[in-house]
A protein has these predicted regions:
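A conserved beta-strand-loop-helix scaffold within acyl/acetyltransferase catalytic domains
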Residues: 1, 41-178, 191-192
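Aromatic (often tryptophan-rich) hydrophobic motifs at membrane interfaces
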Residues: 1, 9, 17, 23-28, ...
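A gly/proline- and charged-residue-enriched helix-loop-helix capping module
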Residues: 3-47
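Short intrinsically disordered coil segments
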Residues: 6, 75-84, 243-250
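A short, structural micro-pattern
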Residues: 8, 32, 54-58, 88, ...
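A general structural signal for short secondary-structure junctions and capping/turn motifs
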Residues: 28-31, 52-54, 86, 219
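Active-site/acyl-donor-binding loops of N-acyltransferases
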Residues: 43-71, 198-276
Length: 276
C-alpha cells in the first residue's frame, strides 16, 4: 500500500501546528502504511519525532517581493545586476507566455537538459500541456522564454498559488549559456511576481552540495532555509521498490546521448508515471 501526497513537490509540510496535532495524524498514517517519507521545511514536530530518521537535507531559497522595481533592483547582488544588464545589451530578450504558445519550445529545452546533462528521462509533454491548460491559461502562472536572435536559449516555468509564485522548472540551451539567459530570466520572474501582486517568489529546492546553483540563487534571494528528508525508522522495503532498478536501467538506456530525442521522449511517456 502506498500513500502519495503532492508527488514531485520540493517540500510538503504536514498541516499541523505542534506535536500535539502531529502525533494523532502521523499515527494514523503509520497505521495505514508502514512506509512514510516526508520533506519538511517549516514543521519541526516531524523532525523531532523519534519514530523518524533524517535521511537527507536540501537548501531552500526565497525572494521577498518588494513594492517597487527600483527597490528590488537595488537589493539583488551587484553581480546579478551586471549580468542582467550585459545580457540585455548583448541582445537577449525575455517574453511572457500565458497560454499554450511556446510550451513546446520550452519542452525541447527541458528534454535536452534532462537527457544530455543528467542522463534522465523528462516528464511527458502532455504533463506540460496540462500545466498550461490548468495554470497558464487561467493566469495562475507564466512561461518566460529568453531569446537570442531567432533562437530560444532559456526558459522558466512559474506557477502561482495565492500570493506565492513558484519557480518550478528551468531549462537552457547549452550553447546559448554564453549569453547569460538565466539572469534576465530570474529578474523577469521577480518583475512578474511584483506586477501580479505576489509577496514571495519561491525558488525551491537545491541539493546541499550544488554550490553553483546555490551561489546563483543567493544573488537574488533574501531568504534561505533547510528542507529535511525524513523516513520512518526500520520501514520495510515496499514491494514496488523491486522494480526500481529495472526502471532505472531502462531510463539510462533510453536517455543515452546516442538515442534519438523522439525515442527518449517516448520513454518518458511510458515510464515517468512509475517515478512518483
Amino acid at each position: 500500500r502506498r500513500i502519495v501526497s503532492m508527488p514531485f513537490s520540493d517540500y510538503c509540510d504536514p498541516l499541523v501546528e505542534d506535536d500535539s496535532q502531529w502525533q494523532p495524524v502521523s499515527s494514523e498514517f503509520l497505521r495505514l502504511s508502514p512506509v512514510l517519507k516526508l520533506r519538511c521545511r517549516r514543521s519541526t514536530a516531524p523532525v523531532d519525532d523519534e519514530r523518524f530518521e533524517k535521511t537527507g537535507r536540501a537548501r531552500w531559497h526565497g525572494v521577498t517581493i518588494l513594492p517597487t522595481g527600483e527597490e528590488a533592483w537595488q537589493r539583488v547582488d551587484g553581480s546579478a545586476r551586471r549580468a542582467v544588464t550585459k545580457a540585455q545589451r548583448a541582445g537577449v530578450t525575455v517574453t511572457r507566455v500565458c497560454d499554450g504558445q511556446g510550451v513546446r519550445a520550452f519542452y525541447d529545452l527541458h528534454l535536452a537538459v534532462r537527457k544530455y546533462k543528467y542522463g534522465l528521462l523528462a516528464q511527458p509533454f502532455r504533463f506540460f500541456e496540462s500545466i498550461s491548460a490548468n495554470f497558464l491559461t487561467r493566469n495562475q502562472g507564466v512561461l518566460l522564454l529568453a531569446h537570442f536572435g531567432e533562437r530560444t536559449i532559456g526558459g522558466v516555468l512559474l506557477l502561482r498559488w495565492k500570493d506565492r509564485l513558484y519557480y518550478k522548472f528551468n531549462a537552457s540551451y547549452a550553447p546559448g549559456l554564453e549569453h547569460r539567459p538565466n539572469d534576465p530570466l530570474m529578474w523577469s520572474a521577480i518583475e512578474y511576481a511584483r506586477e501580479t501582486g505576489c509577496e514571495l517568489l519561491d525558488l525551491g529546492l537545491t541539493d546541499w552540495d550544488q554550490e553553483g546553483l546555490i551561489r546563483y540563487k543567493r544573488k537574488y534571494a533574501d531568504l534561505e532555509g533547510e528542507i529535511s528528508f525524513l523516513e520512518r525508522k526500520g520501514a520495510p522495503q515496499a514491494h514496488h521498490v523491486a522494480a526500481g532498478p529495472l526502471i532505472g536501467e531502462l531510463s539510462q538506456l533510453l536517455a543515452g546521448p546516442t538515442v534519438p530525442d523522439s525515442v527518449t521522449e517516448e520513454g518518458g511517456n511510458l515510464l515517468y508515471r512509475y517515478f512518483a
